[in-house]
Amino acid sequence: MPHRRSVGFIETLALVAARPVVALSSLEILAEAEAEAGWPVLAVVDARRGEVFQQRFGPDGAEGPPVVGRPEGVAPGPGDSQPVVVGGDGADRYPEWYGAELRPGREPSAAVMVTLAGQRPAVPGHLVAPVYLRDPDVHINVTTRHTPR
C-alpha cells in the first residue's frame, strides 16, 4: 500500500477504534535494528528513480533530518572519519556508494517497531502527519479539472 494511503488508513483505524497511535519512520526502525554500542547507523532505503532516502542515527537518536537524493550526493564520503554501520535495501542497491560495514538484506522489523513504539508517547491519530521527502508524482490541475465540457 502506498505511503500516503497507509497513513490515512492508520488515522481512520485510530479514529474508529478510539485508540492513540505512535509515529515511527522506517528509517528509525532500520537504525534501531542495526544499533551497536558506539557505532552510528546510516539507514538507507531505495527510493527508486536512482535515489535513496537516508538518515544518520547516533546513540541519542537521529543526528539530522531524513534526506532524499542520488547516492553519490548523500552517501558518506572519504572524509567521514567515524565508522558507520549501514543498513537497508538502498545500501544493498548501491554498494559502490556505501562501502562502510554493510549489513545486506535488512528491512524494517515488526519486533523492533513494537519495541520502539513502547518507548514513545502515543497521540491521537489525527495528530500524526506523514513526512514526505519529495513532492507527489501526480498533481491535479483544479482549473482544468472543473471546467464544464
PLM feature spans:
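Surface "functional belts" at beta-alpha junctions
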Residues: 19-109, 125-126, 132, 137-148
